[in-house]
Amino acid sequence: MKYLRMYLPPFAPDYSGVCSTLFELRGIVVIHDAGGCTGNYTGYDEPRWYGSKSAIFCSKLREMDAVLGLDNDLIEKIKNACTPETKFAAVLGSPVPMLIGSDMNGIATELESQINIPCIGLDTNGFNLYNKGISMAEKALAEIFVKDTNIKVQNGVNILGMTPIDFGLNENANDLKEMLKHWGYNIVACFSMGVKLDDIANAAKAKVNIVVSQGGMALAKIMETKYKIPYVAGIPMGDVGAEVFKKAVDNAIENNKSFVFGKDDYKIQTKDVVGKNIIFIGEQIQGNSWRGAYNKIHPHDNVQVGCIFGKDTSISIDYDLDISNENDIINLLSNEEYDIIIADPLIKQLIPKEKLNNIKFISFPHVAVSSKIYWDNIPLFIGDNMNKYLLD
C-alpha cells in the first residue's frame, strides 16, 4: 500500500514527460494504450495542449490486441498517420503493454524500416514519474540527432530538462533565455521549449549544459563523458542566485568544471541549525536553487530539499530526503518541526492542523502535482522575480 493516495493526485507519469519533451519537434508520438493514458497527458499534464498543434495520438489498444499481440496493426496505424512533414515517430508504452511484454523498441525498429524516418521506441509504463520520461526522451533525441563535431560556439550553452511540467506556461522559460542572452551566452539548443531538431543536431557545439530540472541530468552526464561538456545544474533564482549562477557558468566554460547550485556552494552541511528550519518540497533542482540563493542571504538558516519525484544523490546533500509517496510526506510533516515550508498548494493539507499557525507556507505550484488546478498560479522564479520570497 506504499503508493496509496488519499489526499494527493497521482503525479505526472513517465509518458507525460516524454510527450512534453517531444511536443514541439514536429514528430508523431503514439501512446500504446486504450485511451486513458493519452487523455491523462493531454488533459492534465500539458498546459500547451489547448491552442497548440502537436501530433500526439492514442493507439486505441483493445482487449484482443493485447491478447493476440497485434503489433502490425499498430504499425499500420502509425504509417497512415505520418505525413511528408513528419520528422520522426515515437512509440510509447503504458501499463497494459508493460504487463504483456510489448517490445516498444522492436516496434519502432520495424516501423522505421517501413517509413524511412527516425523512429523511437520507449518502454514507458505509467508507473515511473515524468522526470524519468524527460530523461528517456532527451537521451533518445541526443542519440539519434546530435552530430559529433569539434566545432564549438563561442559562449555556447544548451538548456536541458526544460518543459512546462517544471516551468509552467508563463514567462519563466523566456526569462531564463533572455537572461542568458543578456549575459552574452549563445543558446545552441534548448531541450525542449522553443526548439527545432536542427538546434538539437548542433547540441555538441555548446561549451556548457545548463540543467534546469532533474530530468535533464542523465543527458548532462552523457554529454559530459562523450563530448567533454561540463554542466551547471541550477536555476538563477533572485539577484544573488543569478550572480552565483553566472559565475558558475563562466567557470564551467573557462575551466571545464561542472557545478551543482545549492550543493557545491552550500555552507551548512548538518541538521544542527542556528536559525530557521526550512524545507522545499518539490522538484530537486528547483529546491537546490532555492536553497543556494536563500542561503546566501540567510546563512544561518537551514534549507532541506524534500524530493517528491525521486532523489538523485549526485545532486543532493546528505540530509535531503526522498519522499516520493504520500505517506512519507505525512510522516515527515507530522514528526519534524519546520518554520517555513515551500511546496505545491496541495501539500498544505498534509500539514497537521495544530502546526499550521506556527508555519509559514509558501505556495509553489507544480504541474506534476496539482495539474490545471494551479498551473495558472506558477510563480515567476527567474532572477529578481524571486527576490520577494528570498529576502523575507
Question: Residue ranges of each PLM-predicted region?
Answer:
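An N-terminal assembly and electron-transfer interface module characteristic of large anaerobic redox
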Residues: 1-392
